[in-house]
Amino acid sequence: MAGLKLQAVTKSWDGKTQVIQPLTLDVADGEFIVMVGPSGCGKSTLLRMVAGLERVTSGDIWIDRKRVTEMEPKDRGIAMVFQNYALYPHMSVEENMAWGLKIRGMSKAHIEERVREAARILELDGLLKRRPRELSGGQRQRVAMGRAIVREPAVFLFDEPLSNLDAKLRVQMRLELQHLHRRLRTTSLYVTHDQVEAMTLAQRVMVMNKGVAEQIGTPVEVYEKPASRFVASFIGSPAMNLLDGVISASGDRFELPGGLALPIGADYRGHAGRNMTLGIRPEHIALSSQAEGGVPLTVDTLEILGADNLAHGRWGDQKLVVRLAHQQRPAAGSTLWLHLPEHQRHLFDGETGQRV
């Protein structure tokens, strides 16, 4: 197995604006890292730099303790799996999986051994003579993974490999990818815009925004302790409720427009008068009552999801979403009294967006 290291890596197209700002990342041997973020955040550019398909403006890339910054892609010990499968339509499954080894001059017996083993792992044994047009989307993606596996790379690079699949098949392929990584334990760098993929597949998640790694941590860490307002808004479905306000002069209240306020147990006197954003996830809001000092939410709409429901409404001028149990279906226009537990709240600096 091999590790991957990015050391102060940057990318600029025009020599002025950095689309990837200085980024350092250590990926341990056998670790599965997922880069997630919105379109244009730089995640695919970074993956292509690791692959050698884009030049690094500054910084270094190391694979298996070897500096590969200027190496050709074929010499880096990587294998890529793409969104569009990139299979040769005129070749069989077996030929597609073997082609990369064949052009490298590997012996026929060795190629056959690797292809058979990869086919067994991916349950493609009975499909080796078929052409890509005879396969389902999930089967084609497994062939693309098989072609990467036979190379026995130091690092797997996945570029949104599940994006072309329907919702049901994506769930199935996520499970297959988890199983595959447990078997192979190959260092993997995976790019997606889908936070569900990121949270379910990753050992660590790197949340990217405008060329910056906003947070690198386990799925639990980025969910429970988002490092910034951006991470808080991006990770979680539905998104975290974010309320803009100000810390009171006494440091013990969070004041919102329209005369609304929430007590804050911790002493924030050092931040008195500063603009802040208070966040709380819809699933962390509890039902309460007026007598218990609950926050009144006027329900606008209700989304019935099956296992649970989402109530969208207003507290004064503030929009809030709360996750409710399946049997709780408040009508539009009704009032819910809510409790926002202090230990589930998050505060972010109003200017920098960083966690306080």
Swiss-Prot record:
Q: Which CDD domains match?
A: ABC_MalK_N
Keywords, A to Z, come to: ATP-binding, Cell inner membrane, Cell membrane, Membrane, Nucleotide-binding, Sugar transport, Translocase, Transport
Instruction: State the compartments where it is located.
Output: Cell inner membrane
ABC transporter domain location, by residue?
4-235
- Signal peptide positions on this chain: none
In its UniProt entry, the species of origin is given as Salmonella typhimurium (strain LT2 / SGSC1412 / ATCC 700720)
Binding site residues for ATP: 37-44
User: What name goes with this protein?
Assistant: sn-glycerol-3-phosphate import ATP-binding protein UgpC
Its gene is ugpC
